[in-house]
């Protein structure tokens, strides 16, 4: 099997594992904050084993990562995403949660101007308009107060996910200016993910104590969500993206928002509304088309020169 084929396989495995998160969260009958805390708690050992095993030769880089503010900012953003994703999934449909969170690349485009001084291009504005129009469809339904709140929390999860990318990019730019290109951006990313899970577990600690899963099955699901759906999937994804282009990884990862509502529908009978399907399609198409054109632009310019 070629390296590219392995990359495709690894990203598809990661996206498929990620997609079971909605169903797992739905079937555990306890508080959302407790689920979030336990999920992150059980992800931590797997991530730490990788850091101190696979990256043991990069311990100096690991230590430096812990001293950098943008790495901690990325960790806080990841903790926000982890927590809000679980809360939103409990409050609204799994489809609404994952599709609204999928707008993260659009938030990156919007926030790149104030944070990175990167100009927002016409293509970005078109994608932003498409996503905002799609978002309106999610709020057209006669939502309960919980459903409306869930949609808002899902949007916050997407903003948090965008923050991870932005803050790690800021960290990379600062380190490149100070030390050249010799630092390990990959180690910084895994450190941020591990720290984010530690923070999410600490945030959920009061609910973990007061509202643990009431059944053995619930415990097994939450352990699986942490060790497999969060930690193992992330390691598969990082192994895959190292072998693929950015656009290939992005497009393959779209398997997650497609499969997530399907597993939930099969497992619980929950189905998204027609408006949510229309809005979700608009968001996925807007993000995908923007990514494809963005990837092809340098190649087209090179071919014309």
Predicted regions span which residues?
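Glycine-/small-residue-enriched transmembrane alpha-helix faces in small-molecule transporters
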Residues: 1-38, 84, 129, 143-175, ...
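Specific transmembrane alpha-helical segments of multi-pass solute transporters/efflux pumps
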Residues: 54-95, 101, 137, 226-244
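Juxtamembrane helix-entry segments on the extracytoplasmic side of multipass membrane proteins
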Residues: 3-7, 29-37, 62-68, 140-160, ...
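C-terminal-most transmembrane helix of multi-pass membrane proteins
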Residues: 1, 40, 51, 254-305
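Helix-helix packing/entry segments at the starts of transmembrane helices
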Residues: 97-103, 171-199, 230-266
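C-terminal transmembrane-helix exit sites in multi-pass transporters
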Residues: 51, 104-126, 136-138, 258-278
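Hydrophobic transmembrane alpha-helices of multi-pass small-molecule transport proteins
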Residues: 78, 111, 120-140, 153, ...
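Transmembrane alpha-helices of multi-pass small-molecule transport proteins
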Residues: 30-80, 107-108, 160-167, 191-210, ...
